[in-house]
């Protein structure tokens, strides 16, 4: 929640020194590092939409979902404040707002990007046919690709907490609902797709 949005804020403050590729890599590499570091401890969801997907898949209960989301939002808020303190208000702490194609473009891009993100996470993290040790690379690589290619549309957030922290710190709430509704809807659609993908052979799920 610090490295990715922070890189977006630094890019604005430095007149584009980081670049879109640099921003995408910042997001992807930090996600990869967090999964490698904390995946075996808590699952390293770091994303309310992913936690909702695991809840819908009955991998976590309501109490754990609430705890995960609360921790994710608290961490994002602290990261947003830290970005403002270090970089200043220029760049709005990396806040996400609809850009190139308005609210409609933001909604559909966030829904579709999060659908594929959640599908990747669910398959590599829970399906016994997948190589679990590669989860961090698969997920981090996808995030880097999505953030690089689709960031200019609406931020390529794919993560309500990632959008919440900067919005709170910079007080930028423009169409903020998009960054909750679309990612969660995309994640739930990914759960449905995951069930369809598994149904023909119904392999054991990884615990």
Task: Set out the residue ranges of the language-model regions.
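Membrane-interface helix-loop junctions and terminal tails of multi-pass membrane proteins
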Residues: 1-207
